[in-house]
Amino acid sequence: MLKNLSHVNIWVHDQDEALAFYTDKLGLELRDDVTLPEMGNFRWLTVGLPGQPDAALTLMAIPGPPVFDADTRKKIEELTAKGAAGGLFFSTDDCRATYEELKSRGVDFTEEPSERPYGIDAAFRDPSGNHIRMVQTT
């Protein structure tokens, strides 16, 4: 049987920029940063929340040929930039306080904290355009 969800991948336009955003601004920690020469210098870059060692977010560069042809790569870049290539949800104990903290670190929010039927949430994007929500459930 399946045991845990260990990795979630998101597309990023610039892995170094994404790493700085997720670690410096959001407070995640670096887990892996490995270059694999046998795979065309593919960079395996993961971050995760402190205290959750079994779950990681993989910051994936959008590959070109032979993985994706140029047109497919361009479409993925465009969808990611629009926030339409998936998204992330983080939970928080205090959405409003976390909003203020992240805003002070330079996170650009697309939605301020607001009351929802399930709790309080707010939204922002990473530098690549990925849509991220943080939720305080009630």
List the predicted regions and their residue ranges.
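Vicinal oxygen chelate
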Residues: 1, 9-10, 34-35, 43-48, ...
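Short, solvent-exposed aromatic-acidic interface loops
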Residues: 61-66, 138
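A short, polar/proline- and glycine-enriched secondary-structure boundary/capping micro-motif
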Residues: 67-72
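Short, P/G- and charge-enriched loop/turn segments at secondary-structure junctions
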Residues: 73-78
